[in-house]
Protein backbone atom coordinates (compact mmCIF):
# COMPACT_ATOMS: atom_id res chain seq x y z
CA UNK A 1 0.00 0.00 0.00
CA UNK A 2 2.83 2.39 0.87
CA UNK A 3 4.55 1.61 -2.44
CA UNK A 4 1.39 2.51 -4.37
CA UNK A 5 0.97 5.73 -2.39
CA UNK A 6 4.62 6.66 -2.93
CA UNK A 7 4.48 5.93 -6.67
CA UNK A 8 1.25 7.91 -7.11
CA UNK A 9 2.65 10.95 -5.30
CA UNK A 10 5.93 10.62 -7.18
CA UNK A 11 4.01 10.85 -10.45
CA UNK A 12 2.00 13.78 -9.05
CA UNK A 13 5.24 15.66 -8.32
CA UNK A 14 6.38 15.12 -11.90
CA UNK A 15 3.03 16.25 -13.31
CA UNK A 16 3.10 19.37 -11.12
CA UNK A 17 6.52 20.21 -12.48
CA UNK A 18 5.35 19.47 -16.02
CA UNK A 19 2.53 22.02 -15.90
CA UNK A 20 3.56 24.53 -18.62
CA UNK A 21 2.41 27.80 -17.06
CA UNK A 22 3.98 29.98 -19.75
CA UNK A 23 2.24 28.13 -22.57
CA UNK A 24 -1.12 28.00 -20.77
CA UNK A 25 -1.11 31.70 -19.80
CA UNK A 26 0.02 32.70 -23.29
CA UNK A 27 -2.63 30.71 -25.11
CA UNK A 28 -5.59 31.43 -22.81
CA UNK A 29 -5.06 35.14 -22.13
CA UNK A 30 -2.92 36.36 -25.04
CA UNK A 31 -3.75 33.87 -27.81
CA UNK A 32 -0.03 33.30 -28.32
CA UNK A 33 2.10 30.21 -28.16
CA UNK A 34 5.10 31.61 -26.30
CA UNK A 35 7.30 28.91 -27.83
CA UNK A 36 7.03 30.73 -31.16
CA UNK A 37 8.22 34.10 -29.84
CA UNK A 38 11.36 35.55 -28.31
CA UNK A 39 13.79 32.85 -27.22
CA UNK A 40 11.08 30.20 -27.57
CA UNK A 41 11.43 29.28 -23.91
CA UNK A 42 8.34 28.64 -21.79
CA UNK A 43 9.71 30.19 -18.60
CA UNK A 44 9.51 33.46 -16.71
CA UNK A 45 12.12 35.52 -18.57
CA UNK A 46 10.69 34.91 -22.04
CA UNK A 47 7.16 35.45 -20.72
CA UNK A 48 8.20 38.87 -19.39
CA UNK A 49 9.66 39.82 -22.77
CA UNK A 50 6.85 38.49 -24.94
CA UNK A 51 3.69 38.87 -22.84
CA UNK A 52 4.64 41.62 -20.39
CA UNK A 53 5.27 41.97 -16.64
CA UNK A 54 1.85 40.84 -15.39
CA UNK A 55 2.01 37.57 -17.31
CA UNK A 56 5.67 37.21 -16.35
CA UNK A 57 4.90 37.54 -12.64
CA UNK A 58 2.01 35.07 -12.86
CA UNK A 59 4.14 32.49 -14.67
CA UNK A 60 6.99 33.00 -12.22
CA UNK A 61 4.71 32.46 -9.22
CA UNK A 62 3.19 29.31 -10.72
CA UNK A 63 6.57 27.86 -11.71
CA UNK A 64 8.04 28.81 -8.33
CA UNK A 65 5.30 27.44 -6.12
CA UNK A 66 4.79 24.24 -8.08
CA UNK A 67 8.39 23.49 -7.09
CA UNK A 68 7.60 24.31 -3.47
CA UNK A 69 4.39 22.26 -3.43
CA UNK A 70 6.02 19.21 -5.01
CA UNK A 71 8.88 19.41 -2.51
CA UNK A 72 6.43 19.43 0.40
CA UNK A 73 4.46 16.40 -0.79
CA UNK A 74 6.36 14.01 1.53
CA UNK A 75 5.56 16.31 4.47
CA UNK A 76 1.91 16.78 3.53
CA UNK A 77 1.33 13.04 3.11
CA UNK A 78 3.68 11.84 5.87
CA UNK A 79 5.84 9.73 3.58
CA UNK A 80 8.86 9.57 5.86
CA UNK A 81 12.35 11.13 6.12
CA UNK A 82 12.82 14.80 5.26
CA UNK A 83 15.36 13.99 2.55
CA UNK A 84 12.47 12.64 0.46
CA UNK A 85 11.52 16.29 -0.07
CA UNK A 86 14.73 16.67 -2.09
CA UNK A 87 13.80 13.75 -4.31
CA UNK A 88 10.25 14.97 -4.92
CA UNK A 89 11.51 18.51 -5.56
CA UNK A 90 14.04 17.23 -8.07
CA UNK A 91 11.32 15.25 -9.84
CA UNK A 92 9.27 18.46 -10.21
CA UNK A 93 12.31 20.28 -11.58
CA UNK A 94 12.86 17.51 -14.12
CA UNK A 95 9.16 17.72 -14.93
CA UNK A 96 9.56 21.40 -15.77
CA UNK A 97 12.66 20.75 -17.88
CA UNK A 98 11.16 17.69 -19.59
CA UNK A 99 7.36 18.08 -19.43
CA UNK A 100 5.24 15.24 -20.73
CA UNK A 101 2.63 17.78 -21.89
CA UNK A 102 5.10 19.42 -24.31
CA UNK A 103 6.81 16.31 -25.66
CA UNK A 104 9.56 16.66 -23.04
CA UNK A 105 10.73 20.07 -24.31
CA UNK A 106 10.43 22.42 -21.35
CA UNK A 107 12.01 25.37 -19.61
CA UNK A 108 15.29 26.05 -17.86
CA UNK A 109 13.85 25.28 -14.42
CA UNK A 110 15.36 28.24 -12.55
CA UNK A 111 12.09 29.42 -10.94
CA UNK A 112 11.02 25.86 -10.12
CA UNK A 113 14.44 25.18 -8.58
CA UNK A 114 14.07 28.29 -6.42
CA UNK A 115 10.66 27.11 -5.24
CA UNK A 116 12.12 23.72 -4.45
CA UNK A 117 14.80 25.33 -2.26
CA UNK A 118 12.13 27.25 -0.34
CA UNK A 119 10.18 24.07 0.27
CA UNK A 120 13.20 22.17 1.54
CA UNK A 121 15.05 24.71 3.67
CA UNK A 122 13.93 28.31 4.18
CA UNK A 123 17.30 29.44 5.55
CA UNK A 124 19.16 27.97 2.59
CA UNK A 125 16.64 29.58 0.23
CA UNK A 126 17.31 33.00 1.78
CA UNK A 127 21.05 32.54 1.32
CA UNK A 128 20.42 31.59 -2.31
CA UNK A 129 18.33 34.74 -2.79
CA UNK A 130 21.12 36.84 -1.28
CA UNK A 131 23.48 35.26 -3.82
CA UNK A 132 21.17 35.57 -6.84
CA UNK A 133 19.75 39.10 -6.52
CA UNK A 134 23.02 41.11 -6.30
CA UNK A 135 24.54 39.11 -9.17
CA UNK A 136 21.48 39.86 -11.32
CA UNK A 137 21.80 43.54 -10.45
CA UNK A 138 25.43 43.47 -11.59
CA UNK A 139 25.19 41.31 -14.73
CA UNK A 140 21.74 42.42 -15.97
CA UNK A 141 21.36 38.89 -17.41
CA UNK A 142 19.11 36.26 -15.87
CA UNK A 143 20.95 33.48 -17.69
CA UNK A 144 24.44 34.51 -16.57
CA UNK A 145 23.16 35.12 -13.06
CA UNK A 146 21.66 31.63 -12.97
CA UNK A 147 24.91 30.07 -14.22
CA UNK A 148 27.02 31.85 -11.62
CA UNK A 149 24.55 31.48 -8.78
CA UNK A 150 23.98 27.75 -9.14
CA UNK A 151 27.71 27.10 -8.68
CA UNK A 152 27.89 29.37 -5.63
CA UNK A 153 24.75 27.73 -4.24
CA UNK A 154 26.34 24.32 -4.67
CA UNK A 155 29.37 25.52 -2.69
CA UNK A 156 27.14 27.09 -0.02
CA UNK A 157 25.28 23.80 0.43
CA UNK A 158 28.36 22.23 2.03
CA UNK A 159 28.10 24.64 4.96
CA UNK A 160 24.75 23.08 5.86
CA UNK A 161 26.33 19.65 6.44
CA UNK A 162 23.51 18.02 4.48
CA UNK A 163 25.00 15.55 2.02
CA UNK A 164 21.66 14.96 0.29
CA UNK A 165 21.24 18.71 -0.28
CA UNK A 166 24.78 18.97 -1.67
CA UNK A 167 24.18 16.06 -4.05
CA UNK A 168 20.94 17.57 -5.37
CA UNK A 169 22.61 21.00 -5.64
CA UNK A 170 25.37 19.38 -7.70
CA UNK A 171 22.78 17.81 -9.99
CA UNK A 172 21.15 21.22 -10.39
CA UNK A 173 24.48 22.64 -11.58
CA UNK A 174 24.53 20.03 -14.35
CA UNK A 175 20.87 20.59 -15.26
CA UNK A 176 21.07 24.40 -15.28
CA UNK A 177 24.21 24.43 -17.42
CA UNK A 178 22.71 21.87 -19.80
CA UNK A 179 19.46 23.83 -20.17
CA UNK A 180 21.37 27.08 -20.75
CA UNK A 181 23.51 25.80 -23.65
CA UNK A 182 22.08 28.31 -26.12
CA UNK A 183 22.40 31.13 -23.58
CA UNK A 184 26.06 30.32 -23.00
CA UNK A 185 26.68 30.56 -26.75
CA UNK A 186 24.97 33.98 -26.88
CA UNK A 187 26.89 35.20 -23.83
CA UNK A 188 30.18 34.26 -25.49
CA UNK A 189 29.14 36.27 -28.56
CA UNK A 190 27.92 39.22 -26.43
CA UNK A 191 24.42 38.72 -27.86
CA UNK A 192 22.51 37.68 -24.74
CA UNK A 193 19.34 39.56 -23.83
CA UNK A 194 19.42 41.77 -20.75
CA UNK A 195 16.86 42.83 -18.19
CA UNK A 196 16.19 46.61 -18.29
CA UNK A 197 18.18 47.36 -15.13
CA UNK A 198 21.51 46.64 -13.53
CA UNK A 199 25.11 47.76 -13.86
CA UNK A 200 25.92 46.12 -17.21
CA UNK A 201 22.64 47.33 -18.75
CA UNK A 202 23.26 50.91 -17.64
CA UNK A 203 26.88 50.87 -18.79
CA UNK A 204 25.88 49.48 -22.18
CA UNK A 205 23.19 52.14 -22.59
CA UNK A 206 25.61 54.86 -21.56
CA UNK A 207 28.19 53.62 -24.06
CA UNK A 208 25.56 53.46 -26.83
CA UNK A 209 24.35 57.02 -26.16
CA UNK A 210 27.89 58.40 -26.13
CA UNK A 211 28.53 57.23 -29.70
From Swiss-Prot:
One of its GO terms (molecular function) is acyl-phosphate glycerol-3-phosphate acyltransferase activity. Belongs to the PlsY family. HAMAP family: PlsY. Disulfide bonds: none annotated. The lineage of its organism: Bacteria, Bacillati, Bacillota, Bacilli, Lactobacillales. Keywords: Cell membrane, Lipid biosynthesis, Lipid metabolism, Membrane, Phospholipid biosynthesis, Phospholipid metabolism, Transferase, Transmembrane, Transmembrane helix. Coiled coil: none annotated. Probably interacts with PlsX. This is Glycerol-3-phosphate acyltransferase 2. GO terms for biological process: phospholipid biosynthetic process. It catalyses: an acyl phosphate + sn-glycerol 3-phosphate = a 1-acyl-sn-glycero-3-phosphate + phosphate. It comes from Lactobacillus acidophilus (strain ATCC 700396 / NCK56 / N2 / NCFM). Catalyzes the transfer of an acyl group from acyl-phosphate (acyl-PO(4)) to glycerol-3-phosphate (G3P) to form lysophosphatidic acid (LPA). This enzyme utilizes acyl-phosphate as fatty acyl donor, but not acyl-CoA or acyl-ACP. Its EC number is 2.3.1.275. One of its GO terms (cellular component) is plasma membrane. It is a multi-pass membrane protein.
Amino acid sequence: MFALKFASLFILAYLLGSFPAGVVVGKIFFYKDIRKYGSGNIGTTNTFRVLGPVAGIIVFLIDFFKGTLATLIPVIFNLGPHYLCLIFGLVAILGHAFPIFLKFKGGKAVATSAGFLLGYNVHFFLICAVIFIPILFITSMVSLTSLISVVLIFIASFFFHDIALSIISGLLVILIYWSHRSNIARIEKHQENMVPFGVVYWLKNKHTKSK
